[in-house]
Amino acid sequence: MAATLRPPKQVLLLHALRSLVYHWVGGSGSTCCLCPLGAKRYLLTDSIVKLKEFQRKKVAVACNLPGTKETYLRNLEEKLTQNKLILKEELRTLLHLCTSRDDVELAKHVIYRYHAENRNITLGEYKFGPLFVRLCYELDLEDSAVELIKDQHLQGFFSDSTSFNILMDMLFIKGKYRSALEVLIQMKNQDLKFNKDTYVLAFAICYKLNSPESFQICTTLREEALIKGEILPRRASCFAVALALNQNQVAKAISIFSQIMNPESIICTNLNIMIHIQSNMLKTLIDILKDATEGNLSRFVKRHVFSEEVLVKVREKVKDVPALLAEFDELNKKLHRSGQVTAYTLDALLCHTPSDRQSYTVLLNKRTVSRRTFQPLSQSLWAE
């Protein structure tokens, strides 16, 4: 949808986004009351970033290059000087040869030339955006990626959500939350479709900024997604709940939490405790902990695990009620004895990226029978 056809709510959202970025007071780090350690972790799995795959291709390109890297770069510099046409394969090879900041500077000049020559050719065209962002990811040159992705002269070069997601993840790792928000603004301005990873990143960035403005942005993005009928990932909703709690919007936190499907994760367990703490539902809070310690469950049955940090907050909340305090102390001992307490903070749990599930799928789908002999694959290999 063109920018002129945006509904008023979306225009207000973009205005709020810009206002938060350009009128923010203070540092870019987290002021989250739930995360004193301010853990900086990545949010995307390697199946999305594909850094290892990119690095393997770099090695292959370097090995198969006719001549030397220096000669190849020099020839490209001459083509730029002589205003000669830059070919797609030349740019792709260049991006796989870059190993330094100087190499990336040359790549940026080649990208500008290539895009100027090919801006009107988009159908079925190779997408260089993710390739360049992965290169910046590898070399820790996030500023170069931000510079190009925001440049209006390169409008259309970064036409995919993957480029924006990887860059936001890179900025999140570095704690550059305001810059990450600028990238989110750019993505919104280009009307690129948000996927599940985008929502996780967007809500995580808002959570880290932890301000009334970022809470409003998170709320609006969430409402827009629900209006479109999109199902938000549980991780995204957890960030939204945590942000609402940090902003003391307990009713909103309860509302969001109630819509999470299958709230059985360790994060949801601890967010539920935080909701009860801030809602002053102390008796129910103790009952939840009691339920977690009772029952002769098999060691194969998943038990609820609580953050030590969250349990400290529970004790602080019930310390003025002697009966509840005594009951909590007993439950706390039981939880520790049964291994149901983790040293990870709630922030660390929120920002932890689960392992790739794709690799397990590949293993499950791995062929075990020969198509030729119909024997088990290991035996057929010996026979062949």
From Swiss-Prot:
Q: What InterPro entries does the annotation carry?
A: mS27/PTCD2, Pentatricopeptide_rpt, PTCD2, TPR-like_helical_dom_sf
Species of origin reads Bos taurus (Bovine)
Record-given protein name: Pentatricopeptide repeat-containing protein 2, mitochondrial
Which family does the UniProt entry place this protein in? Belongs to the PTCD2 family.
- This protein's UniProt keywords: Mitochondrion, mRNA processing, Phosphoprotein
Q: Where in the cell is it found?
A: Mitochondrion
Chief location of this protein?
mitochondrion
Q: What does this protein do?
A: Involved in mitochondrial RNA maturation and mitochondrial respiratory chain function.
Keyword match Cell division: no
Q: Which GO terms describe its biological process?
A: mitochondrion organization; mRNA processing; regulation of mRNA processing
This entry carries the following GO cellular component terms, namely: mitochondrion
User: Phosphoserine-modified residues are where?
Assistant: 378
Q: Name where the PPR repeats lie.
A: 162-196
